[in-house]
């Protein structure tokens, strides 16, 4: 009997606390949107997410120099991408892919032929 009563108190108490936390969160969001804090936080998040890797980082990831031909870069890219696909590392695959994209933009802007 005491266990049942205790279980009911715990369930009811957690429901009340859950609703209070939810209402406090909604109120905090409303206050933040009035003061512009939410807008600023969102803009900072977008700004940070939009940062691309530098050419130097891309070259380090792929292990190439400035004098490396586009064909060699593609060979290194394919090898690294496949090796990380076997290991199941999506994070490393995405880093390798972003590095190739960065160098592709650099090669196109230099007019060294259109990378394929």
Swiss-Prot record:
Subcellular location(s) per record: Mitochondrion inner membrane; Cytoplasm
Assigned keywords, A-Z: Auxin signaling pathway, Cytoplasm, Membrane, Mitochondrion, Mitochondrion inner membrane, Plant defense, Protein transport, Transit peptide, Translocation, Transport
Pfam hit, one: Pam16
Topology term for the membrane: Peripheral membrane protein
Keyword Transferase: no
Chief place where the protein resides: mitochondrion
Gene3D superfamilies linked to this entry: DnaJ domain
Keyword Transport: yes
Residue ranges, annotated region (J-like): 57-106
Free-text tissue specificity from the UniProt record: Expressed constitutively and ubiquitously, except in root tips, at low levels.
Extent of the transit peptide: 1-27
Cellular component annotations (GO), alphabetically ordered: cytoplasm; mitochondrial inner membrane; mitochondrion; TIM23 mitochondrial import inner membrane translocase complex
Expression induction: Induced by heat, salt and drought stresses.
Any one of the GO BP annotations: auxin-activated signaling pathway
Result of knocking out the encoding gene: Reduced growth, especially at high temperatures (>21 degrees Celsius), as well as warped and twisted leaves at the later rosette stage. Increased resistance to thaxtomin, a phytotoxin produced by Streptomyces bacteria, due to reduced toxin uptake. Enhanced tolerance to 1-napthylphthalamic acid (NPA), an auxin efflux transport inhibitor which blocks polar auxin transport. Increased tolerance to isoxaben (IXB), a cellulose biosynthesis inhibitor (CBI). In single mutants, enhanced resistance against virulent pathogens (e.g. oomycete H.arabidopsidis Noco2 and bacteria P.syringae pv.
InterPro entries: J_dom_sf, Tim16
Function: Regulates ATP-dependent protein translocation into the mitochondrial matrix. Involved in the uptake of thaxtomin, a phytotoxin produced by Streptomyces bacteria, that causes dramatic cell swelling, reduced seedling growth, and inhibition of cellulose synthesis. Modulates polar auxin transport. Involved in importing a negative regulator of plant immunity into mitochondria, thus protecting plants from over-accumulation of reactive oxygen species (ROS) and preventing autoimmunity. Confers sensitivity to virulent pathogens such as the oomycete H.arabidopsidis Noco2 and the bacteria P.syringae pv.
Annotated family: Belongs to the TIM16/PAM16 family.
Protein's recorded name: Mitochondrial import inner membrane translocase subunit PAM16 like 2
Organism annotation: Arabidopsis thaliana (Mouse-ear cress)
Native organism taxonomy: Eukaryota, Viridiplantae, Streptophyta, Embryophyta, Tracheophyta
